[in-house]
């Protein structure tokens, strides 16, 4: 993500084929990371919409997932703004210590059909 007015790097949004060691696999994940100074400006949502458009219209995917720790309310809010739904299949991330409060993750998804309907609203 590049800020148009300044040309500065703000972060990234992308699609990723998940490794087999993660519970939602096999699937394609949408993910984002922004520098903290760029949080709250809608950049993740704007770029996420473009990534989903690419996923469904160019790559012809049928479904895209996203996940984050339960504590990451900002990312969960982005998932909602993208039209994604909580599939109620939380999982313990295998690469995070089980004793960590960041281990439990929530799983969201959006299908191509859901995305098309969301675009009409």
Question: What is each of the regions a protein language model found here?
Answer:
Residues 2-121:
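Acyl-donor (CoA/ACP) binding surface of acyl/acetyltransferases
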């Amino acid at each position: 993500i590049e800020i148009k007015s300044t040309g500065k790097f703000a972060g990234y949004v992308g699609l990723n084929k998940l490794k087999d060691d993660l519970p939602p696999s096999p699937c394609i994940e949408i993910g984002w990371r922004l520098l903290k100074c760029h949080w709250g400006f809608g950049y993740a949502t704007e770029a996420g919409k473009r990534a989903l458009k690419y996923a469904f219209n160019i790559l012809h995917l049928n479904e895209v997932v996203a996940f984050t720790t339960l504590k990451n309310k900002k990312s969960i809010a982005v998932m909602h703004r993208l039209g994604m739904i909580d599939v109620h299949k939380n999982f313990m991330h295998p690469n995070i210590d089980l004793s960590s409060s960041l281990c439990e993750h929530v799983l969201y998804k959006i299908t191509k059909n859901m995305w098309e309907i969301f675009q009409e609203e």
